[in-house]
Regions:
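Membrane-interfacial hairpin junctions
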Residues: 1-3, 143-149, 231
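Hydrophobic alpha-helical transmembrane segments of small proteolipidic membrane proteins, enriched
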Residues: 1-31, 141, 153-154
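Polar-ligand-bearing catalytic/cofactor-coordination segments
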Residues: 2-4, 26-130, 164-233
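Short, flexible micro-motifs
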Residues: 13, 24, 49, 144, ...
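Hydrophobic alpha-helical transmembrane segments of integral membrane proteins
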Residues: 14, 134, 148, 155, ...
Length: 233
């Protein structure tokens, strides 16, 4: 059986994935808020969890710092900083421990020259450049579609770069979560119930990246389908 998807089918698939992503994102925020109220049995703050994880992995040149916002936590390989939102940095709860350990997972990847993180870091400025101009070329492409397909094809090439970036992000995020979960369990940062909650939250976080990659891919295929159909006509 052959499955033939046209650009309309791909459009609805993209919209469907978008709404599923919104639901998952809301569930993630809800769980983070819920687990933020659950006191951690070990009594450690997110900052203490992060510092301990870095030290036990022999990483002493990475700083743990506090930043503003909600779910703004990230690791910066350029400045070598684990940036934790204020609630995570000071929090003594399951959510804070899970998020802090996850971001330290990225620092460990950097320290061990994890190939996918290395590639993603190289691609970050390229992706930023592509993202800056892709909307312009895609809009221009649709405006000029009856005159020339070149602007739209350039937009598609730029969009392909950002799509590739979303897929490169998947192994990076999944590996960081696995490192985090293994470490917090082995080092008794969490008890059994807390571990299940941490795993649940990190799974939802990973799902947001999977859905983002799928949405980007289906939109890319839709744009390619539009160009191909114009060429056939």
């Amino acid at each position: 059986m052959t499955i033939n998807l046209n650009n309309i089918d791909l459009y609805y698939i993209t919209i469907g994935i978008f709404f599923i992503s919104l639901i998952v994102q809301m569930q993630l925020q809800s769980k983070v808020k819920k687990y933020s109220k659950q006191k951690l049995s070990s009594g450690k703050t997110g900052a203490e969890v992060a510092q301990q994880m870095l030290n036990e992995n022999g990483i002493y040149d990475v700083k743990v710092v506090s930043v503003g916002g909600f779910l703004t936590d990230h690791y910066n390989p350029i400045t070598k900083t684990v940036n934790l939102s204020t609630d995570v940095f000071n929090g003594r709860n399951v959510a804070a421990a899970a998020v802090a350990a996850h971001e330290c997972g990225h620092a460990i990847q950097h320290n061990k020259n994890y190939i996918f993180l290395h590639i993603r870091t190289i691609m970050t400025p390229i992706c930023a450049f592509s993202a800056r101009f892709l909307t312009l070329f895609i809009l221009l492409g649709f405006f000029m579609i009856n005159i020339s397909l070149i602007p739209l094809e350039i937009g598609i090439c730029l969009y392909a770069v950002t799509t590739l970036f979303t897929f490169l992000t998947l192994p990076v995020e999944l590996d960081a979560s696995n490192r985090a979960l293994n470490w917090i369990e082995e080092n008794n940062i969490v008890d059994n119930n807390e571990y299940k909650d941490a795993k649940s939250a990190l799974k939802l976080a990973a799902m947001t990246y999977v859905l983002a990659a799928l949405a980007s891919l289906t939109e890319l295929l839709r744009l390619i389908s539009i160009v191909n159909s114009r060429k056939e006509n």
